[in-house]
């Protein structure tokens, strides 16, 4: 399965059907990977004095945005880099450089980074900022968002929480880093339509380079072939708010398969993700046939708005397909008439212009089981140009058609927010049910469905990250430092827990955020969210695996965490 996914993901990434990459980032002729990385010093992963202990090391993989590989907390006291490899997916391709096997961008290995750091120490270049510019990671002349230039970015905070060590801390040497900088368009697209292929390719890069790093250690230490099998922890602080949440997406299935099957010449591979930040955002709901629910679309939204409907698990697809009824404000409703998978329906305004469409997207779960799904895409409520069609803002009504198969159907509104630092005129829509209470009589937030009372069709439970529905990925939630109380924004799993592990993120419920490292050494920022909990969990898990702890599955990791007093939260 890994081999098939490798071919598929890299082919899709090379074809770049979504236009994620600038044209000059594409590698026109990827080369076959050879053994030269074990013999050519210029292709080395780490200097000899930065190699981890083969018996007590654990590789930390990070997939994020604008990871500052030159940061002092990713170096040793002698100045050597702990970053074995980093792939900047959208950088301008450099023929003849490291990473000729990759479909795009550039790869910098430890040997490359050490050269840049040595030049900075010698005064040949001004410092870390110059390293990013001269290496091709940051190019202000290109038509992309220069997120690496931001003083305090998401990737910097995540990377240092997961793998940052003081240069004089000997523990850092046993945690080499393999990182991937996702293209800015992937980070900007909060709906996640562009991310699966990029993330899948990133996972495969980390696994491939982790295997090569182990072979590199064997060669440099003169150890038997196949004897070094370092474990790997991969942190993915990304997520979606709409999806099946049952582990059936390609990305979730792949992470589960890798967690179970691993790689024959590596130790265990574990994935850590945030639980999510949208418990109180009113993006998750339920409906039965014949019921309807409000869906509020704000004005001045120049992006499309998405919502997904998912039915229960069934033994085969029913003859009477799932149908939905959509009613825009001020217009008549329309009901789909799906008869076969992958069909779509269009909704038009009185002038005949398209304002929404619905796709019938059933998903095969294996063993003859299916889940019916419908994805709804509504046009922007504010067009870029006057001649373009647009959807009316206000309260839409969505219903499960009365003749649909009897069951409870799950609704998920897709995230549609402006990511800090990115210019995108998005506005978040939400579900509306009069029974849903934001505050109680005393003005306090209502944080659980039990506190809410009644039977609202907008829910707080089950609001977890839609990437984290697999059986083996680990979900990290956030608590505040003062009371160790689950953060109000922290999403809930299906069992209403805040995650498999909870980490301190906010200083108090009235003081959100924690101090995190910025892009430059010594700089800092203030960040909040479960994206800051996940790297703390990744760091802890990497330390446990390096110490030889056996954690075969999610329950074992939970048990280990609960047995240790030094566990975050």
Which positions does each model-derived feature cover?
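Active-site glycine-centered loops adjacent to acidic/histidine catalytic or metal-binding residues
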Residues: 64, 276, 529
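N-terminal domain-start motif of subtilase-like serine proteases
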Residues: 2-62, 66-79, 137-151, 380-389, ...
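Short acidic, glycine-rich surface-loop motifs adjacent to enzyme active sites
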Residues: 22-28, 181-182, 203-248, 274, ...
